[in-house]
Amino acid sequence: MLGHVRDLWPRRAGGLPPGQGLVDTFPRFGVHFASPLPVVPPEPAIEVRGAVTTPFELPLSALDELPRRTLVADFHCVAGWSVRDRHWEGVAFRALWEESIAPHAQPGITHLVFTGLDGYGSALTIEDALADDVLIADRLDGAPLTGDHGAPARVVSPQQYGYMNTKHLSRLVLHTREPERARHSSGVRAFMLSFVAPHPRARVAHEERHRHLPAWSLRFTYQRIVLPILATRMGPNARSPRPLDDHVT
């Protein structure tokens, strides 16, 4: 089977970052890709905890009071696949931070841990979280987010690999130093993430795939693991991706 699955591996197309290849579809992927979608509460909110004067809840409806932003950006998975020109809509996280969160924050915030309804979390440095292109998005390609892509709202940080883009956002914890378990989950998933040792910055342009290992050493491993899974996620179109250029890196 790997004979034809290997043909699916996206070849490097012009303009993509190091180690990335282009695919046609935008599959649900990640640590939780095979799990049932989380249940969204009738009135979703973001719990704000950690280094704040008083913990509070921020209803997602509060996003309606902030200026809307549209962002067209590529999405890059740490496993090596990319999709181009996704149209995200939402609010700039910087605007949400300055309007609703920073007034309650204690001095010296260095990291923010975003957690979703599915229990997955990612830790961003305050510098990365406040970048101009980081959104809390509720729409993708002209339609409300589906469960596969993070409904009701998710983090979109295009300069970082997908594992920093927490879906189903429901909790934000402020820290004054790097959390010991920056990416937290439970059971088998926690073990998997500790083995993978994700990079704390995960910047695509620097190919920061792993906390300790050089990026090139992971490309073959990720391809061996991800190829069969990607084939099943692409469904009936898996055997006929659109032509890509032949420059492989």
Feature-to-residue mapping (PLM):
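Extended, aromatic/histidine-rich regions of cofactor-dependent oxidoreductases associated
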Residues: M1-P42, I46, A102-T249
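Mid-length scaffold segments of soluble, non-membrane domains
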Residues: D74-S122
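Residue-level marker of positions within ordered structural domains that often coincide
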Residues: T53, S82, E98, Q160, ...
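A glycine-rich, hydrophobic loop/mini-helix early in the fold
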Residues: A34-V91
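Short N-terminal helix-initiation segments at or just after the protein's N-terminus
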Residues: L16-L22, T53-L58, L96
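Short acidic (Asp/Glu) patches
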Residues: P59-L63, A92-E98, A137-L140
